[in-house]
Amino acid sequence: MIGIWLASLACQTTAAYSAAPPSATVLQAETPLATIDRILLMADQGRDIAAIKVAVDKFIDPRINEASVLRQINEMAERIRTKIPHGADAMERTALILKYLSEDSEWNQHQTFSYDLDDPFGTKLENKLLSTYLRTRRGNCVSMPILLLALGQKLGLEMTLATAPSHVFVKVRHNGTWKNVEATSFGVMTDESYRTKTHISDLAIANQIYLRPLSRRESSVVVAEAILEKLKTTGSQQTRLDVADKLLSYDPKSVQTMLHKGNAYFHMLKNEFLDHGPSSTPLSTQSMLRYRHLQRENRRWFSRAESLGWREPRTDDDQRYLEDIRRKRGSLEENG
């Protein structure tokens, strides 16, 4: 298999420490909460991840043609299906999907997919959309595993999403056990490799916040977190909190959603108090109560995540990741 380890510590954006640049606000035909309710209902009804992801993406960018994106995915799945030999097991079928995505051939119309080296920290929400990935053929640790899962489901594989700190990958059921598939490098990895590379604590493993195969509901929460990213810069922070509460009702262990809650309270604190600078006039009793409430809730949600085993991303990991990107880019330039 090709590629290097490309699990960016910010690919699944850690809401408290990085922010996508603001984009133009687009009027939505549906409220964020209504969208979330519809998406979670789709999961309960057994809809596949492709339909759920495209519904989320449509909220992010209303210009997206849902039918066109789903048609492209169906066509890809059918091309792969023609190459699956009779009796192929789960890992053999998975390998064919990875080959279709990564190896240049007439089979995939010479259109290979690769990691987006221009957005190594996944800061641009647009780059996490399936429509963007299908158009540019460059993805990240959100769009790449979701497309892999979408194709796997359409080909009858028992697949699901799983997470590591700030990262999403795929698990496939093979001979009664779950195997990890790393979509950003088109290969397989062990749980221990993920633990080492992303510094997963024993406490996090004990609390099962990472590496576990996610249910259909839990996978839909991972996909829907993009709506929280959208609301961070274009919506009200209270709406962001309401959406986060709805997602936590589906996956109480979603650390990423907890971080969004903590960050939303920080933004409220910043907007209502910190941005106004020091004042010679003391805060009113009501304002002081509000200030303390926002401060307390901000700390509570980050403390909640930490109590389950989440740890703040390490700056030295970010630096090593950027060095990996530079080496990868240099290698591509030499060979290209």
Which residues are covered by each model-predicted region?
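Bacterial N-terminal signal peptides
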Residues: M1-Q12
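A structural boundary/capping signal
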Residues: T14-G336
